[in-house]
Amino acid sequence: MSEPADLVSEIEALENKLQEAKSSITRRFIGQERVVDLTLTALLCGGHALLIGLPGLGKTRLVETLSTVMGLHGNRIQFTPDLMPADILGSEVLDTAEDGSRHFRFISGPIFCELLMADEINRASPRTQSALLQAMQERTVTVAGEDRDLGVPFHVLATQNPIEQEGTYPLPEAQLDRFLVQVDVEYPDRQTERDILLATTGVEEAEAHQIFTKEELLAAQVLLRRMPVGESVVELILDLVRAFRPDEAGVSERVKETVAWGPGPRAAQALMMTVRANAMLQGRLAPNAEDVLEMARPVLSHRMALNFAARARGDSLSDLIESTAAGLVRTEAAA
């Protein structure tokens, strides 16, 4: 077969495997298919995800299930104000050998895993958050002056409660930008909640089964980068990201009046990756404008902010992103 035909065959095989993974995940994490898609998107793209939702919506259950299905060694850290960097990274202890000699031995922290759940990440101090920041970006940690490799794959799925703000330390823009997507976990509808009730209060609960190995996940991440992206989609991504920069020439008056700062180049990179994953999860061989529209809010909402006047008026950042993206897609379709 020719190389394009080989690529098509590989993508189709991966799409089938992803559908198996989704089916296994949704046996334990019922409903909320969009949440499952976005977390899988983060893993396929080799990135990290920030899950925002109220307690009791199944975020921890989702991460545990993902760990099983994707064949990843997972750890969980409950972030608190007194959590120190050493509690995450690990530390060196002084050991005494049988002959009386002493030497330092490194005890690795919970960050040395393949899928880390950082629960209530905004409750940790900025000092502890910065330790996680290095790990997320560089996939290495520095302990006692020595760099230690975390290896691949390494993914952080962090959770945050949008309501409780007392005793929290808001994540700085630099750290928010390290998350590939923001996943809003909302209340289930009535039928989904009924299904959850019946599935989780009986004698037996459904079990998730491993579908991927970590080697297969790494191969999928490489394959995703080989998926072709049309020129019109590339231009739409650039138009969308630049449309939210208030100082950019030609942006709308609404953006100038409401946006404090817009997304940087990393947002365009994130869109370029996530539209491919979104297309793959929906069984298509290449992304289109609809993928850009679907990924606009998860990719951009944590990479920009409304100004004080807009927040005082009660303006919605999500509405701004979705309406602007929809307008650009309509313009592109009419061209």
Residue ranges and their predicted role:
Residues 10-54, 242:
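Pre-Walker A (pre-P-loop) alpha-helix and adjacent loop at the N terminus of AAA/AAA+ ATPase modules
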Residues 119-120, 131:
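Walker B catalytic acidic pair
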